[in-house]
Amino acid sequence: AYDATRDADGHPYGGRYFLAPSKADMERLVAAEREWSSRKDADLRVQWPREELPFAYMTHQANFALPEQGYTHWYTMFNPRQLVDHATLLRAVVTGQASEAVKHQALGAVQQYLRNNNGFAIWNIQADKLEPFFSNSNYAPKDRFIENSVFGVLGRGNWLSCAEGIVEGVSWMAR
């Protein structure tokens, strides 16, 4: 959460702080579950993976066998709110009126956003920040689950920061 007064008073983190979920937050989660249920086989039906996780050493044998932890399909790595966000962003990219080159660049931002918003991203206590999926090479289920705001302007892993990385890359390439 953010509090401008705390920011103006000089509190640590520029007025940002962790906030326990409120009743309204829980209602938003329920609303996201309902939205996902109503849209997943309608307008978003081709924007999410239904495939089972392929058998591989890192997913089925090493560390934690993901199917034994409840992760049987790619979509099980996301909660319903994340699935709505991801599928909606992906749909906007693939159905948009942009050129193929711009769509490919936007897909790069979607890929980065996926890394930062899933059930395997964590809060890194030592570094005091979100760490995206594949920060290391294991698929171990996480005990410090974190979720950020899709369109927030602060922090790592929101849509803005993921899209900015693509813009920076294109600018660098044009030098």
Task: Give names to the regions the model predicted.
Residues 1-175:
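Nucleic-acid modification enzymes, centered on SAM-dependent nucleic-acid methyltransferases
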